[in-house]
């Protein structure tokens, strides 16, 4: 079952990052990574060809209050996003009784391979189970997105099944893999 999220006053600080609400002043940093071919496509959306597209998405992020900007502490640059979305578990007979949210993330190609996405994801998972009335967090990756698969494995999610995802913005059906982490998985450790 879906739950409401409001991150408008939430700041999560990790060793190298700050997860924080988006601001209009983030537009240039956002466009810098969202306009690079291959970045958005790994998450199901086409890279931004025009800054006005980024501006529209930025406004949706600000108004939606469910997606964080990922800011590097060292240089105060926004290099990605991570946030909550409606979970695939809401439509699954086995899991729909759970209060669940899906997490999704995107990071600048310039920062791939530095362990920043797992750092952000682990912090968001910890915050979620500490501050939200949530039973489960779900996540999925496109089958050929091995970087995302590694992030999911590093975070300790449990594989559920392979499936397909209708990436409407890309006008494609894509094979994906779905994972879940239950609150009980955390409390058992």
Residue ranges and their predicted role:
Residues 1-41, 71-189:
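Acyl-donor (CoA/ACP) binding surface of acyl/acetyltransferases
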Residues 58-69:
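A short helix-loop-beta-strand connector motif used in the catalytic cores of GNAT acetyltransferases and
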Residues 47-50, 61, 128, 135:
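Hydrophobic alpha-helical elements and their junctions with loops/disorder across both membrane
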């Amino acid at each position: 079952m879906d739950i409401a999220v409001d991150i408008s006053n939430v700041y999560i600080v990790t060793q190298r990052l700050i997860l924080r609400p988006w601001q209009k002043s983030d537009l240039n940093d956002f466009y810098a990574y969202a306009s690079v071919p291959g970045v958005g496509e790994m998450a199901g959306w086409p890279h931004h060809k025009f800054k006005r597209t980024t501006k529209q998405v930025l406004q949706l992020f600000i108004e939606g209050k469910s997606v964080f900007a990922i800011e590097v502490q060292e240089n105060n640059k926004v290099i990605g996003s991570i946030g909550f979305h409606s979970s695939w578990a809401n439509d699954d007979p086995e899991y729909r009784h759970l209060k669940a949210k899906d997490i999704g993330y995107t990071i600048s190609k310039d920062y791939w391979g530095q362990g920043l996405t797992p750092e952000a994801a682990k912090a968001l998972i910890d915050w979620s189970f500490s501050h939200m009335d949530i039973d489960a967090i779900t996540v999925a990756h496109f089958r050929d997105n091995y970087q995302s698969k590694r992030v999911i494995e590093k975070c300790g999610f449990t594989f559920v099944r392979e499936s397909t995802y209708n990436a409407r913005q890309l006008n494609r059906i894509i094979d994906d893999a779905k994972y879940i982490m239950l609150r009980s998985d955390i409390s058992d450790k």
